[in-house]
Structures are given as C-alpha cells and as structure tokens.
Amino acid sequence: MQRALLSSLRRSAGIRSGVNSMRVVRPTVLAPRMSMIRFASTEASKKEGKEDKAEAQGSQEPETAAETNKEAEGAKVEVSEIDELKAKLTKKDRELADMKNHYARAIADFRNLQESTKLEKQKARDFALQKFAKDLLESVDNFDLALNAVKEDTLKNNSEVKNLYDGVDMTRNVFEKTLARHGIEKVDPIGEQFDPNQHEATFEIAQPDKEPGTVFHVQQNGYTLNSRVLRPAKVGVVKDAEN
C-alpha cells in the first residue's frame, strides 16, 4: 500500500514538473515564431507601402502627363491665337495702306479734274472772247487809220478838226482800255527784232542807220490775249544791205 501510494505521488509530481517545464519552455519556443510573424508583417507592410507608393506614383504620373498635355495644348492654342491676331493685324495694315493709297489717288484725281476743268473753262472763255475781240479790233484799226490820216498842219490850223481828232483819239483809248481789262493788249514792236511768232513781215527795206532784222515800221498793230498772240503785227523789217 505504501509503495503504491509513493509511486502515485511520484507520478503526479512528475506530471506537474513536466507541466511546469512546458510552461517555462513555451515562451522561449514561441519567441522566434513571434519575431518571424512580426518580421513577416513588417515586410508585408513595407511591401504594401511600396505598392501603395507605386500605385500613388502610377496614379500621379497620368495626372502629371494629362496636366502637361493640357499645358502644351494651352500653349499651342495661345500661339495659334497670337499668330491669328498677327495675321489679322497684317491684313488690317495692308487694307489701311490700300485705303490711304486710294485716298491719295482720289485726291490727286480730283485736283487734276479741278485743274483740267479750270483750263477747259478758261479755254472756252478765251475762245469766245477771242472771236469777239477780233471783231472789235477792226473798229480799233479804223480809229487808227482815221487818226493817222490827219496831218499835223491841219491840226494846228483847224480847231474843229483838232476837236474831232481828240474825240476820236479818246474813243480809241476807251476801246483799248476795255480790251485790256479782258486781257487783250496792243503790241507795238517798233525797234524790236523781228519775231515770226509775233510779227508778220509785209516788206523789207535796207537802211544803213538801222540794224538788219529790226522792225522800223508798223502797218497794223498786233494784239495778244492773255499773253498769247491774238493777231500778229504787220510790220516792215530792215533788210541787210549786202543781201
């Protein structure tokens, strides 16, 4: 009986000691496992962090690329708008230059038209006056012929003839002044060189005391209309004695 009781006590003590040894040993055995679990979790978290970072970078890269594309497109749009504005400005400058050119030509044409119209009116006026003046010149010529027909002795001895002569001379002067107001002037070429554009030679006589080619006698007075020859003077010209 005692032996059986001792053996049972020993067994129970052994079992307890084994349990205690297991309790003591278990933490030592589990420590490496926990460290491995922690390492694995750390690696997993690192891997997940890298993956998240990569995903974030991957998500950011398309956004950055999209923003870059938008900026590039915006820059292209701005450049195209600037080019379009430059083209419009150049076109407007050309149109403005053309308008200025047309305006200058229009002004020049208008001034030329004014000048030509003025000249045409003056020509028409001169032509009408020329025809009328030529008819009046015959009357003036008759006054000259009448006055030249009276001799000086008659004027000295006959007062009535003298009064008539003075009246005819005054009438002639009135005619000449009236013609002068309209640009018609008498030409007296005595002593001038013969000019075929203004004079008409009716005869030539050699005179030793006068220079050849000069006008020494006026048979009919000449007249000009606004400095143009209305009627050439009929004159006698000194002839060269050697010819």
UniProtKB/Swiss-Prot annotation:
It holds the Pfam family GrpE. Its main location: mitochondrion. It is found in: Mitochondrion matrix. Residues 44-55 have a biased composition (Basic and acidic residues). Keywords: Chaperone, Mitochondrion, Transit peptide. GO terms for biological process: protein import into mitochondrial matrix; protein refolding. It comes from the Eukaryota. Residues 42-75 are annotated as: Disordered. CDD domains: GrpE. InterPro entries: GrpE, GrpE_coiled_coil, GrpE_head. GO terms for cellular component: PAM complex, Tim23 associated import motor. GO terms for molecular function: adenyl-nucleotide exchange factor activity; protein homodimerization activity; protein-folding chaperone binding; unfolded protein binding. Essential component of the PAM complex, a complex required for the translocation of transit peptide-containing proteins from the inner membrane into the mitochondrial matrix in an ATP-dependent manner. Seems to control the nucleotide-dependent binding of SSC1 to substrate proteins. HAMAP family: GrpE (MF_01151). Belongs to the GrpE family. This is GrpE protein homolog, mitochondrial. It comes from Debaryomyces hansenii (strain ATCC 36239 / CBS 767 / BCRC 21394 / JCM 1990 / NBRC 0083 / IGC 2968) (Yeast). The lineage of its organism: Eukaryota, Fungi, Dikarya, Ascomycota, Saccharomycotina. The gene is mge1.
